[in-house]
Amino acid sequence: VHLTPEEKTAVTTLWGKVNVDEVGGEALGRLLVVYPWTQRFFDSFGDLSSPDAVMGNPKVKAHGKKVLGAFSDGLNHLDNLKGTFAQLSELHCDKLHVDPENFKLLGNVLVCVLAHHFGKEFTPQVQAAYQKVVAGVANALAHKYH
């Protein structure tokens, strides 16, 4: 991902304020609610029968935290996202058979959740930088599919 120095600063400054537990669970939960077909990858998570069930599900929250942990790692390696996400790409492609389009959906949901959490601080410039990052991460996660 090519970010200007200003974009890198915007991304890392905001990310330093993110509550990974809260935002991760909310982002994954929203993905599962807004795009219900993604729930098929989470059969072992128990009750996903309603938006309230999804958003309150401890397994969704725990996995969301894990997802954002990996995203955080990516932010530390923006110049090598494909290398950083190589193992996760392989896992999601070969073992889990996740449609790579879902990575884009989750990235866009994450941007919405960040905008909700940070309000006016999530300026159009910050959003543009995050859109670049989530697109780069989605591309890196889809790399094994190519």
UniProtKB/Swiss-Prot annotation:
The modification Phosphothreonine is found at T12. Heme b binds at H63, H92. GO terms for biological process: hydrogen peroxide catabolic process. The modification N-acetylvaline is found at V1. The modification Phosphoserine is found at S44. The modification S-nitrosocysteine is found at C93. Red blood cells. GO terms for molecular function: haptoglobin binding; heme binding; hemoglobin alpha binding; metal ion binding; organic acid binding; oxygen binding; oxygen carrier activity; peroxidase activity. Residues 2-146 form the Globin domain. The keyword Phosphoprotein applies. Involved in oxygen transport from the lung to the various peripheral tissues. Heterotetramer of two alpha chains and two beta chains. CDD domains: Hb-beta-like (cd08925). Keywords: Acetylation, Heme, Iron, Metal-binding, Oxygen transport, Phosphoprotein, S-nitrosylation, Transport. This is Hemoglobin subunit beta. The keyword 4Fe-4S does not apply. Belongs to the globin family. GO terms for cellular component: blood microparticle; haptoglobin-hemoglobin complex; hemoglobin complex. It comes from Mandrillus sphinx (Mandrill). It comes from the Eukaryota. The modification N6-acetyllysine is found at K59, K82, K144.
